[in-house]
Structures are given as structure tokens and as C-alpha cells.
């Protein structure tokens, strides 16, 4: 067992290109694995039941020190206890099912506009031309942010996720300071105006004990929603198109209405989770068999491994869109379950429907390029062609 697990290297070229290799090693090893190839070192949970239980125990597994491997004093939605509950109530109305359904027509319009731009191209890129701009535009509209410079916004989001996974997070701070300054300017502008229906206006004007959120927390909350609102969905769309085009006959079966789109989305989330895992921090010692994780230690909840746990999923290394997806854990569970999960699914549904209708002969040119940070799993490039 130890021989299998001792060569785990989440940042190796092999495991970055195929995270299922890491998942298999973890699932064949200890329930709690000590990973010392990162500074600071951390533990990894990989079993589905262990992760599910940990995510439902927010008093033991804390969010407030950041959900990456580095220790930070976090706030906004990445927080704990009553404060997290209050912050979540500020943003939740925009992500309830009723609000999400009202966005479907607008999503269809954005998607059609994006695909119109590439209609006459023989070759184009799923990421650059569709899966990146679609979620960025819609999250900007939800927040009330101008959409005139989405490439700059995408650069900020990329810097944020890179910082989250880096042993040298300070190298990304200069770029992120620009994002913070931009958001703070918008927040101050909204505070000087009557409150409107935008989410940024609600964030700017919300109060705790009759005081506005601090500038830092308002900016962090806005940044968290902005980054989460596009990174996950971008990879979900790209990953699913990639699998549909790379697995024999899967795209043709989809075009022929032999596969249900919701089943495909659920299975893509299981098989290719856009986030391979997030981190918690222990508030007390926690023991798994003969391994004790000390207090104040970072623990990675490895969603990618949990989604391939054979105790939960039959034949887990096979992409099967007919399986029951209710236990897929990619959006987390418990009080920190992803607020934008239904929006991400709807965006993917709209994108896939449009591709199927307009480009039934879609072909993969090559496998493109993987996103960089080890916690994330998606395509930063995915070139395709159509006749």
C-alpha cells in the first residue's frame, strides 16, 4: 500500500495531465495522506465518506483560513459560523433557482452572439470563443459590472486561482491589487447612489450591526463571487465538450438525442471536476485509522478522488452519463455548498444545446492545453473544427 502512495506528486507533469492517476494512488493508500511536496505541507482526504462527513462538520473543518493550501485570514463567503451565514444571505437571492431560470433567455442570447462570431471560421477554440466569455459576461451582468473588458477580468481571475495554489502567492499580488482597486471604486460609487437591483449594490449597501461591510470584506466578497462565477463553469463546459469529442461516438450519440444533457453534465462533474479539491483547516486533532491530523492543519478535500471511490460509484473510471449523479460531490456539500451550482449547470446546458444545434459535425483538432494550477482541472485551450 505505501509503495503505491509514496510517489504521489500532484504537481508532476504526469499527474497534472491526468489527475485520475493521483486519485487512484490516494484511494489505494491511507485515508489521511500527509503531502510534504508543498510548502506548507498538508493532509489529503480521498474517501467519499470521509470527505462527506468532514464537509458536514464546519466546526472541526474551518473555512476561515482560506480554501487553498496557504494560510490566510479570509472573509466574505470563505468564512465560518454566524458571519458566513450573514454573508451568504446577502448573495444567495441571485443564485436561487427562480432567479437562475430567469437568466436562461439571456444566456441563450449571449451564446448565440458568441457563436455567430465564429460561424464562418473553419477552426476555433471552445475555451477562447465560448466557455470563457459566456460565464464571465453573465456573472458581470449579475454583479452589475461593465462587460467591456472581459479579457482583463479573465486575467484577474486567472491570477486569483494561480495565487491560491502557489507556494509564492505574493508574485500575483500586484495584478490582484488592480482588481481590488477596480472593485473598490465600483463599491464606493454604489454606496453614493440609491440601492439598485445589482448584486454589487446589495454588497456595497449591506450592513452588520448598522455598519457597512469593511472595504476589504466587500472587495473580497465581490472578488470571490466573480472568480467562482466563471472559473468553474468555464472548465465544466470545456471538459464536457472535450470528453464528448474524444470518446468514441459520444458526440454523435449526443447529436442524435441518444444521451440526456443533464446526465452528461452530472457525469462530467464526477469524471472531470473543475475543482479537484478545496482546503479546510482543522480546529482540533482528527484521527483516521492510525493517522492523526493535528489542530491548525490544512486538509485537502480531494473531490476528484472521492468521485472515483468504488465504494460509492460502480466502475468509476468509466464515463457513463446514465449513472445516478446525486452523490457527485464536486460542488461540495453542507453549509459551504457552492452557491452557483445551478447557474453553472444552466450555462453548460445552454452552451451544449447551441453547439449541438449549430455545429453537429464538430471535431476535436487536439486535446488543447490544461489549465495551470494543480487544484483546477480544465482546458485553457481546446481547438475544434466543423464542416
Whereabouts are the PLM-identified features?
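Cytochrome P450
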Residues: 1-387
